[in-house]
Amino acid sequence: MFTVKYENNNAYITVPDGIDLPHTLDCGQAFRWEEKGNGVWHGVAYGKYLELCKEADGTLALFNTTEHDFESIWRKYFDLDRDYGAVNNKLSKNEILKNAAEYSFGIRILNQEPWETLCSFIISQNNNIKRIKGIISRLCDNFGEDKGGYHAFPTAERIAECTLEDLAVLRSGFRAKYILDAAQKISSGEIDLEKLKTVSTDAARDELMKIKGVGPKVADCALLFSLCHIDAFPKDVWIKRAMQVLFGGELPDEAKPYAGIAQQYIFFYARETKLSV
């Protein structure tokens, strides 16, 4: 269990099961975080700007953070109430997953705002990280609320008011029509993202795939990174190949309740060990 203390408008968190900032913030889960230098990261989530770092003793430092913001945003965002040690012990019943978990120590699932996450992964289709971040930056700068020095991610309602001509400024190509369709379905209530947290993973996936351009991979990213479905397992070509090499294509049974965490570990492990896929 983590502990937190507040001092000089900063929050200092001791996380017994660790947090690795580069491998959590810059691994393709979220796209609005950047390293400023000297291990300090900054970004925007839930309309709030945050700077943070991990200190020499492993303490996670959140700067200029109120107790209210920590309790209402960052505690859940960084998944601090989940016992990753216990999860890793269960995964470690499989020797390959044990190695992957050890390699990936400190990677955590980010619990993000659902609309932002869905929209971001629509943008991510057939795209690279640099370009994804560029499109999202233009989306926020042009349509997000000005918070004084930074912009919040625009609401689905704001985007639903736009035309495809309005969205041309994003330079997002074919993705613009998918962004607009998603915004319209969310803002109208046709798809209720909050409700999807309470239904089965399969049912939630089917609902998200009613949006134009949303296939299983984009849906599973939204489910895992924003809708509390820790058993969602996003699959792209690369992870499918890694799964085939490591497990013959089928995730071991002990991993299935935590498939999303296992997916992050497998991806990182395969990349870092230069697994031939």
Question: Over which residues does each language-model region extend?
Answer:
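HhH-family (HhH-GPD) DNA N-glycosylase catalytic core used in base-excision repair
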Residues: 1-277
